[in-house]
């Protein structure tokens, strides 16, 4: 598990804080550093070194005196209790970016892929104390899961996704999550029913400024070769009644209603290759 940062300006002070007791940082790397333009720095935890290392960076606070680039994730991680592992890495946005002017809460809609419930799990990380997390509705209509303090997190069970099947795997199901204060979100997904084929990515909150066009996603199928090759797929969240075009043509994927927010619907479009636009 790791967090990497890169400075965009000289003399940038970077601090890593809110780290739990009991962790062992690789190479005893200091948790405070000054970087110049283009320099990078990594804090890493080996889960085999200490039990606290398994989730010791989830909820850690990265702060800097000047703008930085931050990537985080795991090179050998899993949501599953099985032995399968895989990479899960993404670039994240700062708190100021995910905060919405005039709005104290966050809304998220997650769309599941091809994994089972223990792999298909949203991860909510609180940035502020007293952050209540609800599923399938807000603080009036939803189910309260937990009240988090700053730096705490919840990994939401995949059974909360809509349209569950007997096997626990139903690609395209969705989940609406509402947090009483601005919070960060990540999503674990599965490329197949094999627990080793999983991924983790950063999820931005719902925002009226979200772009209507994504052009393009290059060579979407190029994620592996041989026995681990996948056809490309995308998940889409749109307003109800929107015309959804994939590569200029109306998608044949069926929309799924969102339990907890009837103004939106979701799609899972699979079997794609080449460059993709939405």
Whereabouts are the PLM-identified features?
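Conserved functional hotspot residues at active sites or interaction interfaces
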Residues: 1-59, 63-277
């Amino acid at each position: 598990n790791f967090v990497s940062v890169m400075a965009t300006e000289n003399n940038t002070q970077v601090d890593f804080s809110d780290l739990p007791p009991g962790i062992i940082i690789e190479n005893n790397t200091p948790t405070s550093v000054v970087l110049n333009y283009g320099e990078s720095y990594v804090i890493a935890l080996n889960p085999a070194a200490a039990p606290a290392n398994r989730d010791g960076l989830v909820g850690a606070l990265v702060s800097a005196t000047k703008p930085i680039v931050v990537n985080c994730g795991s090179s050998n991680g899993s949501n599953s209790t099985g032995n399968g592992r895989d990479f899960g890495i993404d670039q994240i946005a700062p708190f100021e970016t995910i905060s919405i002017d005039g709005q104290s809460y966050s809304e998220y809609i997650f769309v599941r892929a091809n994994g089972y419930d223990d792999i298909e799990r949203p991860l909510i990380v609180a940035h502020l104390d007293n952050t209540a997390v609800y599923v399938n509705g807000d603080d009036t209509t939803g189910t309260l899961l937990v009240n988090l303090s700053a730096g705490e997190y919840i990994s939401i069970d995949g059974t909360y996704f809509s349209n569950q099947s007997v096997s626990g795997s139903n690609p395209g199901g969705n989940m609406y999550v509402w947090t009483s204060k601005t919070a960060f979100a990540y999503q674990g997904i599965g490329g197949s029913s094999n627990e080793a084929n999983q991924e983790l990515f950063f999820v931005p909150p719902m925002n009226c400024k979200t772009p209507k066009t994504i052009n393009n996603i290059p060579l979407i199928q190029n994620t592996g070769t041989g026995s681990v090759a996948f056809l490309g797929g995308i998940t889409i969240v749109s307003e109800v009644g929107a015309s959804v075009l994939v590569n200029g043509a109306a998608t044949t994927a069926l929309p799924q209603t969102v339990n907890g927010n009837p103004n939106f619907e979701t799609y899972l479009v699979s079997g794609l290759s080449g460059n993709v636009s939405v």
